[in-house]
Amino acid sequence: MDKISIRCFIFLVLTSFVTTVSCLSAATDYREVEDEHEFSYEWNQENGPAKWGKLRPEWKMCGKGEMQSPIDLMNKRVRLVTHLKKLTRHYKPCNATLKNRGHDMMLKFGEEGSGSITVNGTEYKLLQLHWHSPSEHTMNGRRFALELHMVHENINGSLAVVTVLYKIGRPDSFLGLLENKLSAITDQNEAEKYVDVIDPRDIKIGSRKFYRYIGSLTTPPCTQNVIWTVVKKVNTHRYFLLFFT
């Protein structure tokens, strides 16, 4: 191999390495931040929502993104889908652990996997689910007591979130299963509690109508092109205010 060929070979190897590292970095940067100390939901704070886009370079979409979430579900970006044929669930029981992330409560699943959904022909694996109180999305200006996000990811790293809204009313059987575990970590930021085997199919999706739009993560880095599917029917529960406020 002559000197020119060697130089070309080295250049190609280095280029391939840099490209691979860049792709790996991109694949890890889109995930939502779990450390609540890096940002705040208080608008009057230096690290509040209005400043998220300036806190870190990789969070710039929080300030400049044009497809940000949450939004009001009456927004023109949203369409009402009247059947669930485009959303097929293939969930299965899986070991799970609850974590108090400060800004929300998260249920993360074990490495064995908790199944997936199919959205428009593409499979998205369920990574975790978490709750926000009060709700982040609104419906005709109305904010609800609780909002569940079921976060999914496809093979290319794209995200899809299935959302269920809750109001005060009859107890919800799925939340009821978690009440004791939730209460144990309510006042302990970053605390974790093993839950045992959880079946995501137990989460009630009692409607064949849902809202669909393309948005973003609702926490930094505010990654866009997230497929949001918000169940139209609002669920109920009577105890969650104790655990999520």
Swiss-Prot record:
InterPro entries: Alpha_CA_prokaryot-like, CA_dom, CA_dom_sf, Carbonic_anhydrase_a-class, Carbonic_anhydrase_a-class_CS
Tissues where this protein is expressed: Expressed in stems and roots.
Gene Ontology biological process terms, A to Z: response to carbon dioxide
Catalytic activity reported: hydrogencarbonate + H(+) = CO2 + H2O
CDD domains: alpha_CA_prokaryotic_like
Glycan attachment residues as annotated in the record: 95, 120, 156
GO annotations of cellular component type: chloroplast stroma; membrane
Gene Ontology MF terms: carbonate dehydratase activity; hydro-lyase activity; zinc ion binding
Keywords for this protein: Chloroplast, Disulfide bond, Glycoprotein, Lyase, Metal-binding, Plastid, Signal, Zinc
Record-given protein name: Alpha carbonic anhydrase 2
Organism name: Arabidopsis thaliana (Mouse-ear cress)
Chain's gene name: ACA2
